[in-house]
Design a protein with these regions (language model features):
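Nucleic-acid nuclease catalytic cores
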Residues: 43-68
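Helix N-cap / beta->alpha transition motif
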Residues: 33, 61-65, 84
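Short, intrinsically disordered terminal segments enriched in charged and Pro/Gly residues
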Residues: 68-75
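Conserved catalytic cores of phosphodiester-cleaving nucleases, focusing on short active-site segments
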Residues: 8-10, 15-26
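Beta-rich catalytic cores
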Residues: 4
């Protein structure tokens, strides 16, 4: 196994692969390891995502933003921010369609 590979690998109905790193935070800090940042940055041209569950909201970032997300945390503007109850269909339409 290679260090830094995201938690989820999804294959859509068209055969395209999507990688999603899952994180949980109670503050503004998003803990990404150096290996995770390197992998997400290296493959940022593809469908790579970082999904962060905060206290109340769900934040979605593109993998190519991993370096900035690690340094700025949730202060970095997300690609998508969802309020509870989460609109999972909207999230899936953006990430795997």
């Amino acid at each position: 196994m290679t260090l830094g590979i995201p938690d989820l690998l999804v294959c859509d109905t068209k055969g395209k692969f999507h990688f999603i790193e899952l994180k949980v935070t109670v503050g503004n800090v998003v803990k990404l390891s150096p290996n995770q940042v390197a992998w997400l940055t290296r493959h940022g041209h593809g469908s790579t995502w970082i999904m962060v569950r905060g206290r109340e909201d769900l934040y979605l970032y593109q993998g190519k933003d991993a370096v900035e997300l690690r340094s700025k945390g949730l202060q970095l503007k997300p690609y998508l921010q969802l309020k509870y109850p989460f609109d999972w269909e909207k999230l899936f339409d953006l990430t795997i369609n």
